[in-house]
Amino acid sequence: STDWDKNKELGIDVPVISHESGQRCIYPNFKEIPNFTGPVQARNFEVYRDSLKAHGMLDQADDFYQVSGAQTVLEYKDVIEAQLRTYLKSGFQLLSINDFTGQGYAPVGILDPFWNSKGLITPEKFREFCAPTVALLRFSKRSYYNDDVFTGKAEIYNYSPSALKNAKFKWWVTDADGKVLKSGKLKTQNIGNHGVFSAGEFSYALNGITAPQ
C-alpha cells in the first residue's frame, strides 16, 4: 500500500528531518575494481569476487548486480515518496547517492564511489520521484486480482517557487509490455505550493486483464 504517511506522529512544534533514509545495499560491481588506482584498493571487492568464484557462480555476478540494483532503485523510490507524502516532515537525507567507502563499505548508492552512474537509473527518472514537484499516487494494496477495481488517489507534492496554474493531469494503466489498457484525465485545476495537494482520484476495473502482469 502507498495509502499511508506519518503525519499523525509529527504533530510537534519542532522540525523533523529523516536521517539516512534507505541505505539499500547493491551487489558489488567487479568491473569497478580497475578504477581503484590510488592508496585505497578494492580489497573487499576482491574478497566477494573470489568467494563467488569458489562457489562456481562468478558468471552470475552481473546478474546479481543488476537485479539488486533494480530492487534498490524501487525501494528508494518507495521510501522517498513516503517521505514526500508526509507533508509535516521538514525534510529527509540519504546516506549518500554514491557508494560509501569509509569505515568499512556501504554499496548503497545509485552512483559508484567515483560518482559515476551505475547504469541503474537516469537522472531524469530519479527526479520523477525526488524533485521540488512530484506526482504521487495513493493506492490500497500492491497485489490485485482481475475481479478487483483499482482506485488511485492522486496527490501533488509541490515545493517549487510557485503554484501550478491550470494544471492538467492524465493517468494511464499499462500492461507488462507497456501497452496502454486504459487512460483518462483528472480535472484541470490550480495546485498550491509549499505542501502536498489532492488532485483527484480514478478507478479502473481489472476484469479485462487475463494474465499476471
Residue ranges and their predicted role:
Residues F150-I156, E201-Y204, Q213:
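Buried hydrophobic-core signal for structured, non-transmembrane domains
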Residues A167, P212-Q213:
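Exposed beta-strand face motif in extracellular beta-rich ectodomains
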Residues N146, A211-P212:
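Surface-exposed loops/turns
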